[in-house]
Amino acid sequence: MGLRALMLWLLAAAGLVRESLQGEFQRKLYKELLKNYNPLERPVANDSQPLTVYFTLSLMQIMDVDEKNQVLTTNIWLQMYWTDHYLQWNVSEYPGVKNVRFPDGLIWKPDILLYNSADERFDATFHTNVLVNSSGHCQYLPPGIFKSSCYIDVRWFPFDVQKCNLKFGSWTYGGWSLDLQMQEADISGYISNGEWDLVGIPGKRTESFYECCKEPYPDITFTVTMRRRTLYYGLNLLIPCVLISALALLVFLLPADSGEKISLGITVLLSLTVFMLLVAEIMPATSDSVPLIAQYFASTMIIVGLSVVVTVIVLQYHHHDPDGGKMPKWTRVILLNWCAWFLRMKRPGEDKVRPACQHKQRRCSLSSMEMNTVSGQQCSNGNMLYIGFRGLDGVHCTPTTDSGVICGRMTCSPTEEENLLHSGHPSEGDPDLAKILEEVRYIANRFRDQDEEEAICNEWKFAASVVDRLCLMAFSVFTIICTIGILMSAPNFVEAVSKDFA
């Protein structure tokens, strides 16, 4: 037991000595490396040679896309690699020290910034330590929350694909001093976003020349390509708009006597206005392009507005004053003949079979109307009225071709009726008979006027029904064409529906 304890104590002591020696080597190495080191000096063996810096990034997350302010917010880890000529050592002279770390400001590092930064601090990176190995290879990985300006093209919203550029480059060094080289971006640690799908992040190296200097100024641009996920906007904007536009078609199915046709149209129009305001709050105030969903809302509002106008015309037809005149001939031909035939509409009661008259040649013959002498019958005024018709057997009216009056009712013309009423010479028999016949003539004229007014009203009401049915078909077709034509015009409509709504 004593021997084993002694061996364990010796091993522990050896480990402590080794750690103390390694700490001594690190301290010595830091002192030697920073002895004559100047962080302002470009670390190259020959000042005429450029220092090559390899640059790339790791996209961790798309945090926000502000369409209104056109700002992209991302979580990115930058990666910069270069070789520092003054930070090299022999590993054998410093056992166990394979790499060292220098905080920001102690050694030289490239001043690479995001050119199109929209952050208030401009440089949004967290300055971490620089990792250096024995060969002088430096590795600098600063993370940061980057806010970059990005032109948001809302032409195909919400079926849009946005491309935002992240342009990086040295702020003070030109191409002759710092050779910036690009490496492929890393998306292995990317965290998916609920609103956007990352399509890719390709990079490109370009060189720019300015009038002040002959040397080139290299920069690296990574393009964040992302596709909007449309499920949210489809359920909250598109589908309600489609349903509201379908409700607008119900205006033509609502009876004119209900008194709610105009109210329904105005309500639908106000609902679409509310959705338009929601879209306007999301979209940037730009006149470069009109969003796809705004085009669809605008077309739907035009349809609803026209439906309200047509509804006013339909109500004017339905409640047309018969004293205002008969329907014009061209209106009757177009609406009651052509459109009614095309829509397979028939006037109410047109299919009913009218009873045939027993006397076609003598429709108004009064030969069968004979009032014999009535004895013992007292009138309401207390007097006995003896009425007799003589010589009326041969009186009849001219046949008429008017089919608007039901058979069985006297359809004589006013002249024929006048001759009929005076042919029996009622005044020679009894003056009360003349008064009665005058009242009968008034009642007949009144019925005739009512029939004519009713026929005119029915004609206008049928015309209103034809306009309603015609507009229902026309607006339905136009709504379907606008819905399919506008929404499917987006380049990635099929892809968005298959991925987001599947």
Curated annotation (Swiss-Prot):
Ca(2+) binds at residues 42, 44, 172, 210. Activated by a myriad of ligands such as acetylcholine, cytisine, nicotine, choline and epibatidine. Activity is modulated by positive allosteric modulators (PAMs), such as flavonoids, with a wide range of chemical diversity, pharmacological sensitivity and efficacy. AChR activity is inhibited by the antagonists alpha-conotoxons RgIA, ImI and ImII, small disulfide-constrained peptides from cone snails. Keywords: Calcium, Cell membrane, Disulfide bond, Glycoprotein, Ion channel, Ion transport, Ligand-gated ion channel, Membrane, Metal-binding, Postsynaptic cell membrane, Receptor, Signal, Synapse, Transmembrane, Transmembrane helix, Transport. Its main location: membrane. GO terms for biological process: calcium ion transport; chemical synaptic transmission; cognition; intracellular calcium ion homeostasis; monoatomic ion transmembrane transport; negative regulation of cytokine production involved in inflammatory response; negative regulation of tumor necrosis factor production; positive regulation of angiogenesis. Residues 24-233 are extracellular. Glycans are attached at residues 46, 90, 133. It catalyses: Ca(2+)(in) = Ca(2+)(out); K(+)(in) = K(+)(out); Na(+)(in) = Na(+)(out); choline(out) = choline(in). Disulfide bonds join 150-164, 212-213. Residues 316-469 are cytoplasmic. InterPro entries: Neur_chan_lig-bd (IPR006202), Neur_chan_lig-bd_sf (IPR036734), Neur_channel (IPR006201), Neuro-gated_channel_TM_sf (IPR036719), Neuro_actylchol_rec (IPR038050), Neurotrans-gated_channel_TM (IPR006029), Neurotransmitter_ion_chnl_CS (IPR018000), Nicotinic_acetylcholine_rcpt (IPR002394). Changing residue 270 to S/T: Suppresses inhibition by the open-channel blocker QX-222. It is a multi-pass membrane protein. GO terms for molecular function: acetylcholine binding; acetylcholine receptor activity; acetylcholine-gated monoatomic cation-selective channel activity; amyloid-beta binding; chloride channel regulator activity; protein homodimerization activity; toxic substance binding. The chain crosses the membrane at residues 234-254, 262-282, 295-315, 470-490. It is found in: Postsynaptic cell membrane; Cell membrane. One of its GO terms (cellular component) is cytoplasm. Component of neuronal acetylcholine receptors (nAChRs) that function as pentameric, ligand-gated cation channels with high calcium permeability among other activities. nAChRs are excitatory neurotrasnmitter receptors formed by a collection of nAChR subunits known to mediate synaptic transmission in the nervous system and the neuromuscular junction. Each nAchR subunit confers differential attributes to channel properties, including activation, deactivation and desensitization kinetics, pH sensitivity, cation permeability, and binding to allosteric modulators. Belongs to the ligand-gated ion channel (TC 1.A.9) family. Acetylcholine receptor (TC 1.A.9.1) subfamily. Alpha-7/CHRNA7 sub-subfamily. Homopentamer. Can also form heteropentamers with CHRNB2, mainly found in basal forebrain cholinergic neurons. This is Neuronal acetylcholine receptor subunit alpha-7. It comes from Gallus gallus (Chicken).
